[in-house]
Amino acid sequence: MKKYNNIIRSFIIVLITLFCAQSPAFAIQTISINQGHADPIPIAINKFAAESNVSRLSNNILDVITNDLKNSGLFRPISPAAFIENKTGVEHRPLFAAWRQINATVLVNGKVRRLESGNIEISFVLWDIIAERDIAGEILEMPEKLWRRAAHKIADTVYERVTGDKGYFDTRVAYISETGG
């Protein structure tokens, strides 16, 4: 009987040793994050005030700004057909309640004019509809041929002031080719 007790005792010791030596089993859980989701910021980009000699140019500038911000994925331009207030330009304070009714968070107002020098002047104001205050504004003067670059700069300013990140629309790509030995 003593022999069986020793065998049982040895067997129990082996079982306890094996049991203690094993690492605990944990369920392996894999979480895969492959994309984030943020709702685009609703932005109203109002028609820029312009005299007839620059109205087409004004529309082109507006299109570039709108496309830059929309294509960033962070902004959702509101259709101008939804606008309640129809004042254009930079000289007036917007009717914030009218812009809130169409769920705009920010508003861009602007003006384009041709100067006596032949250059164009583009001015704009960025309004925070919720806080009811302007958060950026600028007057740009340049030769007319640089209108597209000015539009990208305006989009950069809007992007930077609203998101806090540096804008990237006014960038240039350099290509360098090396030939010879």
PLM regions with names:
Residues 10-22:
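Bacterial N-terminal signal peptides
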Residues 152-170:
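Structural signature of eukaryotic scaffold interfaces centered on beta-propeller domains
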Residues 23-27:
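Sec/Tat signal peptide C-region and signal peptidase I cleavage site
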Residues 29-30, 90-157:
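Amphipathic beta-strand/beta-sheet edge segments enriched in Tyr/Trp
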Residues 32-96, 108-111:
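Short beta-strand->alpha-helix linker/helix-N-cap micro-motif
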Residues 166, 178-181:
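A flexible loop/linker signature enriched in serine peptidases of the S9 family
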Residues 1-7:
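N-terminal secretory signal peptides that target proteins for export/translocation
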Residues 109, 173-177:
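Residue position within the beta-strands of beta-propeller blades
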